[in-house]
Design a protein with these regions (language model features):
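Bacterial N-terminal signal peptides that target proteins for export
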Residues: 1-8
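A general secondary-structure boundary signal
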Residues: 13, 45, 59-60
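Cleaved targeting-peptide boundary
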Residues: 23-31
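Mature N-terminal segment immediately following signal peptide/propeptide cleavage
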Residues: 32-56
Length: 263
């Protein structure tokens, strides 16, 4: 797997320089306009310093219909908490999380010492996102993000991630053939490109690096050592920053508490 190595400060400065765009490429809602959008976007990216080789990789992508289908069909976040927990296999995640907390105790102790984040929420996120690494996705990351940047629903949001992905490819931190989930997330805990630039530590296909990076993300979003992370408690806001879906946030908090020894 391609090694992911990052220099945070310079990356974010460069990413800021890449946007916003004064003349955005024309978005669309079907495959028909994707080729024309790529041509227009490529000109913008070239003007912002993206390399010819990376632009060629972008131009080689195909419209990711599976990504669009998945984006349109995210119904699990509309379930009740109990329904969501059952659908996502919460009892299995908690049981496996407890095992890993015990077997990988030194790793989690090190992470908690550095970032203040206990094992529970990290293991809950890991289990929820990829089944502890068993389901990391098999979509082309660049095609997925480019398709979503072209799609009119959230073009501005995914355009930022597309520029981040192009930057990571330019630097050799990601390969144009990188595989990931439907929305372009990569690694054991499913980082988007902008988050990789800001919080990524080493190869995110490696569990220890991904968990460390996840703890770094949570700390950067206000996690305080020793404070609670259930709804209404100080650290719940950091979980909210990880994923915008309320039912997901509550599930992570509940499973994390159970893994950490609560009920």
């Amino acid at each position: 797997m391609q090694r992911l190595a990052y220099v945070f400060g310079a990356s974010l400065v460069l990413l800021a320089a890449l946007g916003p765009r004064a003349h955005a490429a024309q978005c669309g809602n079907s495959a028909g306009g994707y080729a024309a959008w790529k041509q227009e976007f490529a000109g913008e990216a070239r003007a912002k310093g993206v390399s010819t080789a990376t632009i060629q990789a972008l131009m080689a992508t195909n419209y990711a219909q599976a990504t669009i289908n998945a984006d349109r069909g995210q119904r699990s976040f509309q379930l009740s908490l109990d329904q969501f927990l059952a659908k996502r296999g919460a009892s299995t995640i908690v049981a496996k999380g407890r095992q890993l907390k015990s077997s990988q105790g030194a790793l989690f102790a090190s992470i908690q010492s550095r970032y203040g984040v206990p094992p529970g929420p990290l293991l809950a996120i890991w289990g929820m996102e990829t089944g502890f690494g068993s389901q990391r996705g098999n979509q082309n990351m660049l095609a997925s993000i480019a398709t979503l940047a072209y799609d009119c629903r959230r073009s501005a949001y995914f355009t930022e991630h597309l520029y981040a992905a192009l930057q990571l490819i330019d630097r050799g931190a990601l390969s144009p053939s990188q595989r990931g989930s439907m929305h372009g997330e990569v690694g054991q805990t499913q980082f988007m490109p902008k988050a990789i630039l800001a919080y990524g530590t080493g190869n995110l296909e490696n569990a220890a690096n991904a968990l460390t990076s996840t703890a770094s993300f949570l700390k950067a979003h206000g996690w305080r050592a020793g404070a609670g992370y259930q709804p209404g408690e100080p650290n719940f806001a950091a979980i909210q920053a990880w994923n915008a879906a309320g039912v997901y946030q509550k599930a992570i908090a509940l499973m994390g508490r159970q893994i950490d020894g609560g009920e």
